[in-house]
Amino acid sequence: MYRKILVPTMGEYMDELIEHTLDLLHGREAEVICLYVVDTSVPFLTPKKVKEMMVKELTERGKEILRDMEKGLTGPENPNVKFRGVMLEGNPADEIVKLAEEEDVDVIIMGTGKSLVDKHLLGSVSEKVVHYAPCTIHLVRTV
């Protein structure tokens, strides 16, 4: 059914995403690409040094999250999962859609992830991905 799965994550609700992905696979063979996007869209007046520190911290956090996702998705209990971690910089929604297109993924599994206030004011990443993704999307309710 699904041979290539994209799982974007910011680290929140990681367990739910792992569980949903493994449930969807039912032990079948698949490549799972976990994506962490370092969101570089900081307010315009943010000093360069502050932005650099933020990107560095987010990059370190991303490495840790991708390691944790790999541990949760692979191992002796999941021998049919081929894991690949990817870290990109940019706008999360844009990078998710772009990678889904480039990798020709079958499905994106992602959380809803933001509070109602954030969704109303900023729009959510998942909402943008739903509108522009080239494939099926499974949204995991995480709020």
Swiss-Prot record:
Gene3D superfamilies documented for this protein: HUPs
InterPro entries per the UniProt record, alphabetical: Rossmann-like_a/b/a_fold (IPR014729), Universal_stress_UspA (IPR006015), UspA (IPR006016)
Domain of life: Archaea
Annotated family: Belongs to the universal stress protein A family.
Protein's name according to its UniProt entry: Universal stress protein MTBMA_c15380
Organism of provenance: Methanothermobacter marburgensis (strain ATCC BAA-927 / DSM 2133 / JCM 14651 / NBRC 100331 / OCM 82 / Marburg) (Methanobacterium thermoautotrophicum)
